């Protein structure tokens, strides 16, 4: 075979190869384009939340075995705003996914709280550290507790809580962080806890006199303790800075397996122009992911 013929055949081979590569590239681009279009269509098809209720989650509602990063991915996918009851070690991962810590840990524990003066130094220090961390991260809330009665009269405990909270109320105002004392039932789950009635907590907030001192209204706990949920929320909404959900009885799913009708509760909260967060804090008995999706749908009014 002479050199000119060989060169001609090589040229033809190169042209065929280039055509094949170009064709494959076009196919790949086409497939990639179709895949991107399909993903975009799927994203568009996914129903957006109405947004009247800004929802978040606590750790116990997720499927077991998920890493914190996997939980963040899931929260983002489901349209949640963030996660309750975390500290600074989790903040970076939350921010990576465009999420927030909707309630930063700031208490010395449930039993040890502001109702005893001897606890004030520790409780104030912990609260101020949490407020500083929340402010630096741009997060809205910090949780505190009243503490247990241990024989103390409620009016004495209320006065002590007011005194303790006033020690950092101005600091919270300066940092634009709201400190929420949680309402818990003492009837069943937290025997002897002092901040167990909404009226008591609201009176405490009134006496502190700061827009940055409010209540964390746990719907489960207050149904167990005092009932009358809709009327109570309506009366005391100016003093409520955060909500928790769970079913009654059992503290499980908020679906129709329990006694509270959450759609009506959420509509009432939304109609009151509440602009804070509602965090799910139940313990799932059923499939955790499906229960979480359902809880979000129930509260999306």
Positions of PLM-derived features:
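Catalytic domains of carbohydrate-active enzymes, especially glycoside hydrolases
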Residues: 71-90
């Amino acid at each position: 075979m002479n050199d000119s013929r060989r060169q001609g055949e090589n040229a033809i081979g190169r042209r065929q190869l280039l055509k094949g590569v170009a064709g494959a590239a076009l196919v790949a681009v086409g497939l990639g384009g179709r895949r991107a279009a399909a993903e975009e269509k799927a994203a568009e098809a996914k129903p957006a939340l109405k947004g009247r209720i800004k929802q978040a989650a606590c750790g116990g509602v997720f499927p077991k075995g998920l890493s914190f990063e996997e939980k963040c991915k899931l929260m983002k996918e489901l349209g949640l705003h963030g996660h309750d009851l975390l500290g600074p070690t989790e903040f970076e991962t939350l921010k990576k996914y465009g999420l927030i810590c909707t309630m930063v840990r700031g208490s010395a524990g449930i039993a040890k709280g502001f109702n005893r003066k001897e606890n004030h130094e520790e409780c104030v220090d912990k609260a101020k550290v949490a407020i500083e961390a929340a402010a630096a991260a741009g997060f809205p809330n910090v949780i505190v507790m009243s503490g247990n009665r241990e024989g103390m009269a409620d009016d004495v405990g209320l006065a002590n809580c007011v005194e303790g909270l006033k020690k950092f109320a101005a600091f919270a105002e300066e940092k634009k962080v709201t400190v929420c004392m949680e309402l818990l039932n003492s009837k069943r789950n937290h025997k002897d806890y002092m901040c167990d009635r909404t009226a008591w907590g609201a009176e405490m907030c009134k006496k502190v006199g700061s827009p940055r001192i409010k209540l964390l209204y746990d719907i489960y706990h207050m149904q167990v303790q005092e009932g009358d949920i809709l009327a109570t929320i309506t009366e005391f909404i100016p003093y409520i800075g955060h909500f928790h959900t769970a079913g009654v009885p059992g503290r499980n799913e908020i679906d129709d397996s329990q006694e509270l009708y959450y759609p009506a509760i959420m509509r009432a909260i939304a109609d009151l122009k509440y602009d804070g967060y509602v965090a799910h804090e139940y313990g799932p008995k059923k499939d955790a992911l499906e229960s979480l999706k359902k809880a979000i749908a129930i509260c999306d009014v």
